[in-house]
């Protein structure tokens, strides 16, 4: 995959807002030391998280709990 686009990710996640939430949460996990699910190839964490989503390595899980 030469470039990752929003359209690539939207094939896996239907909602743009959910995509943003997933990517931002994954970026935080990567910054805290989580292992990448794909080869990062010297990419920034944002690009790595989007590549993981486009590759189908991450999925959204909705919770009925609301945080205050």
Swiss-Prot record:
The record's catalysed reaction(s) read: RNA(n) + a ribonucleoside 5'-triphosphate = RNA(n+1) + diphosphate
SMART domains reported for this sequence: RNA_pol_Rpb6 (SM01409)
GO BP annotations of the record are: DNA-templated transcription
The record's listing under InterPro entries reads:
DNA-dir_RNA_pol_omega, Pol_omega/Rpo6/RPB6, RPB6/omega-like_sf
The first-level EC class reads transferase
The Enzyme Commission number assigned here is 2.7.7.6
Q: Report the Pfam families cross-referenced here.
A: RNA_pol_Rpb6
* Entry keyword Nucleotidyltransferase: yes
Q: Which domain of life is it from?
A: Bacteria
**Annotated GO CC locations:** DNA-directed RNA polymerase complex
Keywords on record: DNA-directed RNA polymerase, Nucleotidyltransferase, Transcription, Transferase
Q: Which GO terms describe its molecular function?
A: DNA binding; DNA-directed RNA polymerase activity
User: What job does this protein perform?
Assistant: Promotes RNA polymerase assembly. Latches the N- and C-terminal regions of the beta' subunit thereby facilitating its interaction with the beta and alpha subunits.
Q: Which NCBIfam families match?
A: rpoZ
Family from the record: Belongs to the RNA polymerase subunit omega family.
Subunit details for this protein?
A: The RNAP catalytic core consists of 2 alpha, 1 beta, 1 beta' and 1 omega subunit. When a sigma factor is associated with the core the holoenzyme is formed, which can initiate transcription.
Identification of the protein by name: DNA-directed RNA polymerase subunit omega
Q: Which organism is it from?
A: Trichlorobacter lovleyi (strain ATCC BAA-1151 / DSM 17278 / SZ)
Q: Which gene encodes it?
A: rpoZ
């Amino acid at each position: 995959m030469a470039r990752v686009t929003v359209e690539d990710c939207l094939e896996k996640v239907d909602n743009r807002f959910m995509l943003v939430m997933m990517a931002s949460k994954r970026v935080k996990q990567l910054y805290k030391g989580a292992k990448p699910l794909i080869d990062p190839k010297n990419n920034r964490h944002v690009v790595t998280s989007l590549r993981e989503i486009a590759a189908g390595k991450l999925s959204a899980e909705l919770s009925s709990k609301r945080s205050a």
